[in-house]
Amino acid sequence: MHASGYFDVTLAPQAADNPQVRTAQIDRLSIDKKYHGDVQGTSTGQMQAIKDDRNTGAYVALEKVVGSLQGRSGTFMLMHYGYMSEDVVGRWLVEIVPESGTGELTGLSGTMKIIPKDGKHYYEIEYALSER
């Protein structure tokens, strides 16, 4: 199945909590999102990112979505992984953590594509709901 829409996101820097992270210059940010479209709801999470002065770097993130997907209510988790080289995206993968769905989203699996355009973040989700 296919779902699409956009989200508003706020990223807030968090304090580095150990010397190794400060030495490596790994940024830690909180994530707060509001989803519009086929996903209606909010999410919270955390991102870790690293980059150099050429804008080459990578990020990982985890978030929990609370709301509905095409009218089905529940929660699910997302796992992000991405990297870029000198501002060119090399890979950007967002997966629904399999079996993380609750409520009417139990059995949810799939992937999300994020498309930044004109100052907004659009999403496209390809997903399946297994019958349990």
Language-model regions, residue ranges each:
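Targeting-peptide/extracellular-domain and disordered-appendage signature
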Residues: 1-132
